[in-house]
A protein has these predicted regions:
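Oxyanion-binding/catalytic loops of NTP- or PPi-dependent enzymes
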Residues: 6-222
């Protein structure tokens, strides 16, 4: 059974060697969203509950930006890029880049020269995207993570007040609005001590045993 990235991160960080506590792992990856409530300590990692959304992830954020850029270009230039696969791929790549930049900056420039040609005249996509606009475009996606968080807490038989830590996993958790939503949902400052992308890579690379929802922190398998 594949060892999930969040559990591997806990093991790799040594969190499982401290005092017993319950933690919530909020894992927003590229294509899926997973949340787990895990009890750790005494070299043991026990999964108390899991929930999630298999149709929610960072790719959806990219798609929202892409659609906005294409719609704005169509409005100003009267050109529908959706009919041009090559142009759309360029816009998608620019959208993903913009998402990453807006995780640390309030604005970013969109610059795609020669994105289209109309009657022999080249058209360029040049505009500014703000973090505020990005959040407006994606807030409903972020709010969709609330249901699984509440479900996992309920299934574990605890409330957010019982959590000792909230751990963010997955590159999309770098989005500031995601961080704020997790803080709102749990009433706690989410931990960014672990590299979200490294957690995912680690979990994908390592296989381990999972028996009765418990993982012995010292065991490893090829």
């Amino acid at each position: 059974i594949g060892l999930v990235g969040s559990e591997m991160c806990i093991r790799d960080s040594g969190l499982d060697h401290g005092e017993p506590q319950k933690i919530l792992v909020y894992d927003l990856g590229g294509g899926t969203f997973d949340v787990s409530v895990i009890e750790i300590g005494d070299n043991l990692i026990e999964v108390l509950a899991t929930a999630g959304d298999n149709h929610l992830g960072g790719d959806d954020f990219d798609a929202r930006i892409t659609e906005y850029l294409v719609s704005e270009f169509q409005r100003t230039e009267r050109v529908d890029l959706r009919k041009d696969a090559t142009a759309m791929q360029r816009v998608r790549e620019e959208a993903e880049k913009a998402k990453k930049v807006l995780s640390s900056s309030s604005t970013t420039g969109i610059n795609l020269p020669f994105i289209a040609t109309v009657k022999g005249e080249p058209k360029h996509m040049e505009m500014t995207l703000t973090r505020a606009k990005f959040e407006e475009l994606t807030m409903d996606l972020i709010e969709r993570t609330a249901g699984p968080v509440q479900q996992a807490l309920s299934d574990a038989g605890i409330t957010a007040a019982d959590l000792g830590m909230v751990l963010l996993v997955g590159g999309s958790t770098r989005v500031p609005a995601v961080f704020e939503e997790v803080r709102r949902l749990t009433g706690k400052e989410p931990s960014r001590n672990l590299n979200p992308d490294e957690c995912v890579a680690l979990g994908a690379a390592v296989q381990g045993g999972k028996l009765g929802g418990a993982l012995m922190a010292g065991s490893q398998a090829a």
